[in-house]
Curated annotation (Swiss-Prot):
Lipid anchor positions (N-palmitoyl cysteine): 22
Identification of the protein by name: Inner membrane lipoprotein SadB
Swiss-Prot/TrEMBL domain comment: The homotrimer is held together by an extended N-terminal coiled coil, which leads into three separate globular C-terminal domains of beta-sandwich topology.
Gene: sadB
Function: Required for proper surface expression of the autotransporter adhesin SadA. Could be directly involved in the biogenesis of functionally active SadA.
InterPro entries: YajI-like_sf
Keywords: Cell inner membrane, Cell membrane, Coiled coil, Lipoprotein, Membrane, Palmitate, Signal
Coiled coil: 31-68
Subcellular localization: Cell inner membrane
Organism: Salmonella typhimurium (strain LT2 / SGSC1412 / ATCC 700720)
Length: 227
């Protein structure tokens, strides 16, 4: 019994150690699970942060693209505006015939380039000899020109109304045919202003009777089918 009495405490102590060992291993396993879960959470957080950065990068890219589109649209609008303003300027040409030798008229339908050859005096007026060239790829016929002429245009705004009242104008009809790329001589007769005083000329195209084709008869060169 004595021996058995000693054995029982030893057995109890061993059992206690066994239970403590089980608790230790259970706690260690729990810690490992928690560490593993923590790693998984960190991985998920890192993935979310990466996705967030990717989304932010996409948003920044979209914002840059949008800004680029806006800037490009503004530039295109500005360019179109400048072209339209220049186009309106080319609807007619204003020049000092004593100083200008070359000019362009382009109203969107017809494009002409011109060069002034000479200005000669006539009774109560002037005659301008010039060449015109058709910038289109097809012949243009029956051109008419609206012309305004006079003395030098004043630089002061207060003098413009009186100057405009003294300007002369007329419409010059013609049956000339302007072939593509070919210079054609034209004579303008401007009454009322001598060559020494002729410092302003405005030329515009009248489209009323314009023909976009050759007015010269074309021989039929098609061969008749043999019977």
């Amino acid at each position: 019994m004595h021996k058995n009495g000693k054995f029982i405490p030893l057995l109890a102590l061993g059992f206690t150690f066994f239970l403590s060992g089980c608790d230790y291993f259970a706690d260690k396993h729990l810690v490992e699970e928690m560490k593993e879960q923590q790693k998984e959470q960190e991985t998920k957080i890192n993935l979310l942060e990466k996705q967030q950065k990717e989304q932010e990068a996409k948003i920044n890219l979209l914002e840059k693209q949008q800004a680029t589109i806006i800037n490009t649209t503004k530039k295109v609008t500005e360019v179109v505006g400048r072209v339209e303003r220049k186009q309106r300027l080319f609807d007619y040409t204003e020049l000092d015939p004593s100083q200008t030798h070359y000019f362009i008229i382009n109203n969107g339908n017809i494009g002409l380039a011109g060069r002034i050859l000479s200005i000669e005096p006539i009774d109560n007026g002037s005659v301008i000899h010039l060449d015109l060239v058709n910038l289109l790829s097809i012949p243009v016929s029956n051109l008419a020109f609206n012309m305004t002429w006079g003395t030098k245009k004043p630089s002061e705004a207060k003098d413009l109304p009186r100057w405009k009242q003294l300007l002369l104008n007329t419409k010059m009809d013609s049956t000339i045919e302007l072939l593509p790329g070919a210079w054609t001589n034209v004579t303008l007769t401007l009454k009322g202003v001598s060559p020494n005083n002729l410092k302003y000329l405005k030329i515009g195209i009248d489209m009323e009777n314009v023909i976009f084709d050759s007015i010269q008869p074309i021989n039929d060169t098609k061969k008749k089918p043999k019977k």
